[in-house]
UniProtKB/Swiss-Prot annotation:
GO cellular component: caveola
Post-translational modification as stated in the protein's UniProt record: May be palmitoylated.
Native organism taxonomy: Eukaryota, Viridiplantae, Streptophyta, Embryophyta, Tracheophyta
Record's keyword annotation contains Membrane: yes
UniProt keyword RNA-binding present: no
Coiled coil: 235-255, 305-325
CDD domains reported for this sequence: SPFH_flotillin
Membrane topology category: Lipid-anchor
Name of the protein in its database record: Flotillin-like protein 3
Record family assignment: Belongs to the band 7/mec-2 family. Flotillin subfamily.
Pfam families recorded: Band_7 (PF01145)
Name of encoding gene: FLOT3
Length: 474
């Protein structure tokens, strides 16, 4: 006999020539074989599972499960054909089997959770029930197509879920009131904030425009200074080369003159030697002139940089003060005037402190730049004088007017004095003229200690015709 199953059915064939069970949609049924038709359509099972939480509080879990054979797995179909298909899908046997699995897994899971955990994590609780029930149904070849677990229900006499619902409703209502009040507050504050930000942005754009204009002017001035500095450095290099050539020529002339006058008398040798010394002094003056030009260039550049940095710092301070004043003016109009005034005052003081710190930093950078320029000037001067520290010190003292100041102080000390030296002598065994000369000689002997004091203070030696320093140590 030839049998054909419907679209939602399968043929389960057993008997002769078949080891276990053969599932087919259509087949010939031979003598000695048995054929059973079973339906694959899912069936809805409705339950009200009574469970108890970890605190021994009972509750009811209404649920509707749509369960049927797993059609995409041959092994599951074989299990279903063996275990379930002999019974009617709507029979008490199948219904009690499914209900027992669902109730057992639900009660075990609920017993491990508190009522609060069940209520707060309803979705997670339902998912865990679904997973555990499906795990048990797999051994029967069944699949949960859909599981609709309804809202948890109180057991009569226990009002736990209703009280939790009322609590949640009250919390939601209170939170809604808070949200409405907060939204109104944010709206009013946001309106004021937008007006303040508009004024701030306008002031900021104006300030940035002025800063950019000043930066462009400063860059142009810097380029001009750079070009003039390079030209000046080139001129100084050429002058140094000319001075070096003149020095070489003078040295050669001095050498030739000295060679030509070797046979001359000692007096002529002294004259030639003196001429060479004078030529050296001329070269030193040329080097001093070059150094003075370099000093002027470096100091002027450092001064320009210092003034530029100071102006930038002053403008930054002015901009920050105006922004702080705008913020303070807007904050005074808000509902919380005292708090806004304190915040804006703190912000203004902070910005003023930062601006003052920035100005101090720029001023310090200018001082450092000026110090570096002066150091370069002294280093160049020392190199030009052949690392002669004494000559550099004398030049700096002359250039700084120290000798003029010393002379002025000494002149002030003796101003108005009319020294008169009267020498009295009784004649004695010698004539009066000889005694007077002895006194004058005594005054002259006081000059070497005086010269020594001047030498210690200024480093200068007296002319040979005036005397020499005293060798005694006092």
């Amino acid at each position: 006999m030839y049998r054909v199953a419907k679209a939602s059915e399968y043929l389960a064939i057993t008997g002769a020539g078949i080891d276990d069970i053969k599932l087919q949609k259509k087949a010939w049924i031979f003598p000695g074989q048995s054929c059973t038709v079973f339906d694959l359509s899912p069936v809805n099972y409705t339950f009200e599972v009574q469970a108890m939480s970890a605190e021994k509080l009972p509750f009811v879990l209404p649920a509707v499960f749509t369960i049927g054979p797993r059609v995409d797995d041959q092994e599951s179909l074989l299990k279903y054909a063996k275990l379930i298909s002999p019974h009617d899908r709507h029979s008490n046997h199948v219904n009690e089997l499914v209900q027992g699995i669902i109730e057992g897994e639900t009660r075990v899971l609920a017993a491990s959770m508190t009522m609060e955990e069940v209520f707060r994590g309803t979705k997670q609780f339902k998912q865990e029930v679904f997973d555990k029930v499906q795990l048990e149904l797999n051994q029967f070849g069944l699949l949960i197509y859909n599981a609709n677990v309804k809202q948890l229900v109180d057991v009569p006499g226990h009002e736990y879920f209703s009280y939790l619902g009322q609590k949640t409703q009250m919390e939601a209502a209170n939170q809604a009131k808070v949200d409405v009040a907060e939204a109104k507050m944010k709206g009013e504050i946001g309106s004021k904030l937008r007006v303040g930000q508009t004024l701030q942005n306008a002031a900021k754009i104006d300030a940035e425009t002025k800063v950019i204009a000043m930066q462009r002017a400063g860059e142009s001035e810097k380029q001009g200074i750079k070009v003039r500095t390079e030209v000046k450095v080139f001129e100084n290099q050429r002058e140094a080369e000319v001075a070096e050539a003149n020095s070489e020529l003078a040295k050669k002339k001095a050498a030739w003159t000295k060679a030509a006058q070797v046979a001359e008398v000692e007096a002529k040798k002294a004259v030639a030697l003196r001429e060479a010394e004078l030529q050296g002094e001329v070269e030193k003056m040329n080097a001093l002139t070059t150094t003075e030009k370099l000093k002027a260039d470096l100091l002027s550049k450092a001064s320009v940089q210092y003034e530029t940095k100071v102006q930038e710092a002053n403008w930054e301070l002015y901009k920050k003060q105006k922004e702080a004043e705008a913020i303070l003016f807007e904050k005074k109009a808000e509902a919380e005037a005292q708090k806004a005034l304190a915040d804006s005052t703190f912000y203004a003081r902070k910005q003023e402190a930062e601006a003052e710190l920035y100005a101090k930093k720029k001023e310090a950078e200018g001082i450092v730049t000026l110090g570096n320029a002066q150091g370069a000037y002294v280093s160049t001067l020392l190199n030009a004088l052949g690392n002669n520290y004494t000559a550099v010190r004398d030049y700096l003292m002359i250039n700084g007017g120290m000798f003029q100041e010393i002379a002025k102080i000494n002149a002030e000390a003796v101003r108005g004095l009319e020294p008169k030296i009267s020498i009295w002598t009784n004649g004695g065994d010698n004539s009066g003229g000889e005694g007077a000369m002895k006194e004058v000689a005594g005054v002259y002997k006081m000059l070497p200690p005086l010269f020594k004091t001047v030498h210690e203070q200024t480093g200068m030696l007296p002319p040979a015709w005036m005397g020499s320093l005293s060798d005694k140590s006092s």
